[in-house]
A protein has these predicted regions:
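Internal glycine-rich alpha/beta core junctions
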Residues: 34-185
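Conserved acidic
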Residues: 4, 8, 34, 41, ...
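Single conserved hydrophobic/aromatic residue that forms the stacking wall/gate
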Residues: 1-16, 20
Length: 318
């Protein structure tokens, strides 16, 4: 998992490409919030998997110990140098203090890291699934000419690979609790952990490895729709600039609460009557007595949301 070279991570050169800088809608609670870029979404995933790689390296180091210390860890019938020699030959560290077995907190940490990685895989998969929904459709998994999306409905293109990753992630995470429960062995050892590890050891490692390969292939072949991203940005007709408008009103001397209520009333009017927020504000004499038309146009500009994108990229990818 660590040695396989990553193929689908944003690089500085990629950050400069059009699709990575493409503006799209940022969402919180599933609702339109404020504009971001598609590249920032990917950079967020990149940073998370970079942390995961470090976690996995640390977890492998944590679990890479050797114990040949006798029935209860006292070296009663074996020289400690044997343990040291074997550990060196195997590229392991001698366990500082063992019982009949290596303490299982080490293994619990390793499986917990696999669970975290699975959560990250699912986060990307879930984002793809949401963005491929018909109502959003800003991207989709690759769909070959002869592929079938549904046996009953020929028009469908389902995100089946991302759905599969969601299920696989659940399977990997299901191994974490048993690994944690293996820590509490009786006295200097019982065998309750053995049957668990014989199952979760192969299953968790093989599954997360497969999931990472599948995720890489999805990202390598993903189809992005920039025009749909732009279309979705304009769905709410300027409501996404409500925060800037509210903050600008507070600068004119209004309280934040009053500014909030004013902008909220405008927003409700826009929703109810399918109006553009800019037009509603521009037609309000009270607001226009406090904000110039030039300032109003700057409030409804995407530039403020994009001005620090390169800064964020430089901070993430270095």
């Amino acid at each position: 998992m660590i040695r396989r070279p990553p193929r689908s991570t944003p690089k500085p050169s990629s950050a400069a490409s059009d699709v990575y800088k493409r503006q799209c809608m940022g969402r919180s609670h599933g609702i339109h919030a404020e504009p971001i870029t598609f590249g920032l979404k990917l950079a967020s995933f990149y940073a998370e998997f970079k942390r995961n790689r470090k976690r996995l390296i640390d977890a492998i180091d944590e679990v890479s110990t050797c114990a040949i210390s006798g029935a209860v860890g006292t070296f009663a019938n074996i020289n400690p140098n044997v343990e040291k020699h074997v550990a060196k030959k195997l590229g392991l560290k001698a366990e500082p203090i063992s019982t009949q077995v290596i303490p299982r907190d080490r293994h619990a940490f390793y499986f917990s890291v696999l669970g975290i990685i699975a959560g990250s895989v699912e986060r990307v998969a879930t984002e793809i699934r949401h963005l491929q929904r018909t109502e959003v459709y800003e991207l989709q998994e690759f769909f070959s000419k002869k592929q079938k999306g549904s046996s009953a409905m020929p028009h469908k293109k389902n995100p089946i690979l991302s759905e599969n990753l969601t299920g696989l992630s659940r399977m990997v995470r299901s191994t974490v609790i048993p690994a944690l429960e293996n820590i509490a062995l009786w006295h200097e050892r019982d065998i309750s952990h053995s049957s668990v590890e014989r199952n979760i050891g192969p299953d968790a490692n093989i599954t997360i490895d497969f999931a990472l390969v599948r995720l890489t292939n999805i990202l390598d072949n993903m189809i992005v729709y920039p025009k749909k991203m732009l279309e979705n940005l304009n769905i709410t007709k300027g409501l996404i600039f409500s925060q800037e408008l509210m903050l600008e009103l507070t600068k004119t001397g209004l309280t934040r609460e009053k500014s909030y209520r004013i902008v909220q009333s405008f927003s409700k009017k826009c929703f109810a009557e399918n109006l553009n927020l800019f037009d509603v504000v521009q037609s309000d004499s009270y607001i226009m007595s406090k904000i110039s038309i030039k300032k109003l146009k700057s409030i409804f500009s995407y530039s403020k949301h994009m001005k620090n994108v390169n800064f964020i990229f430089r901070r993430v990818i270095r």
